């Protein structure tokens, strides 16, 4: 008889840390009566704008390949909603890609981002803590995709930046900042 091998589902390291340590600490810090009031993560959106794709549609393929390697899932191609003559842009032309990460993929991506990718940025002094949107969500940009280990530096066709948005259930920026700081986001200290 053939044996069906049961593979154990491994919980991401950062998710375990959040459940066991961070959630309790935040509940004490903000004096919540209910554990469900503690801010958590909803999703992470990684967006790569590729404006040059309007002139050459092959450029978008490189961005899709890079984003697939970084996030571990196939990204959506963003198309232009309106035609803009000054940019030589027609409605429906591909102008970027984005991937929305939820669940375990989100936790794994954030773990890799905080522990491996951000420390590889040259002259990195920390993330600005002024980029919250007022509702506890945080957006920041990376100027090149080579900070991720998944990208082979010899095989990149061009340097592409990306925007990363971390959506949380926090009610305000202070809660969001406390959550991300506890998760290991390196914010600038001297302001």
Swiss-Prot record:
Signal peptide: none annotated. InterPro entries: Ribosomal_uL5, Ribosomal_uL5_bac-type, Ribosomal_uL5_C, Ribosomal_uL5_CS, Ribosomal_uL5_dom_sf, Ribosomal_uL5_N. One of its GO terms (molecular function) is rRNA binding. It holds the Pfam family Ribosomal_L5_C. GO terms for cellular component: ribonucleoprotein complex; ribosome. One of its GO terms (biological process) is translation. Keywords: Ribonucleoprotein, Ribosomal protein, RNA-binding, rRNA-binding, tRNA-binding. The keyword Magnesium does not apply. This is one of the proteins that bind and probably mediate the attachment of the 5S RNA into the large ribosomal subunit, where it forms part of the central protuberance. In the 70S ribosome it contacts protein S13 of the 30S subunit (bridge B1b), connecting the 2 subunits; this bridge is implicated in subunit movement. Contacts the P site tRNA; the 5S rRNA and some of its associated proteins might help stabilize positioning of ribosome-bound tRNAs. Part of the 50S ribosomal subunit; part of the 5S rRNA/L5/L18/L25 subcomplex. Contacts the 5S rRNA and the P site tRNA. Forms a bridge to the 30S subunit in the 70S ribosome. PANTHER family: 60S RIBOSOMAL PROTEIN L11-RELATED. Belongs to the universal ribosomal protein uL5 family. This is Large ribosomal subunit protein uL5. It comes from Micrococcus luteus (strain ATCC 4698 / DSM 20030 / JCM 1464 / CCM 169 / CCUG 5858 / IAM 1056 / NBRC 3333 / NCIMB 9278 / NCTC 2665 / VKM Ac-2230). The gene is rplE.
């Amino acid at each position: 008889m053939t044996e069906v091998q049961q593979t154990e589902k491994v919980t991401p390291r950062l998710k375990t840390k959040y459940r066991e340590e961070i959630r309790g600490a935040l509940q004490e810090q903000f004096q919540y009566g209910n554990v469900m009031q503690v801010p958590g993560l909803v999703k992470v959106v990684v967006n790569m704008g590729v404006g040059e794709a309007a002139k050459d549609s092959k450029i978008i393929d490189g961005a899709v390949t890079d984003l697939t390697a970084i996030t571990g899932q196939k990204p959506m191609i963003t198309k232009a909603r309106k035609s803009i003559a000054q940019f030589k842009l027609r409605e429906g032309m591909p102008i970027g890609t984005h991937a929305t990460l939820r669940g375990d993929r989100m936790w794994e991506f954030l773990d890799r981002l905080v522990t491996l990718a951000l420390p590889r940025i040259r002259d990195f002094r920390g993330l600005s803590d002024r980029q919250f949107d007022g509702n506890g969500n945080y957006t920041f940009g990376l100027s090149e995709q080579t900070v991720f280990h998944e990208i082979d530096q010899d095989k990149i066709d061009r340097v592409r930046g990306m925007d990363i948005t971390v959506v949380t259930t926090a009610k305000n920026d202070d809660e969001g900042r406390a959550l991300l700081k506890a998760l290991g986001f390196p914010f600038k200290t001297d302001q």
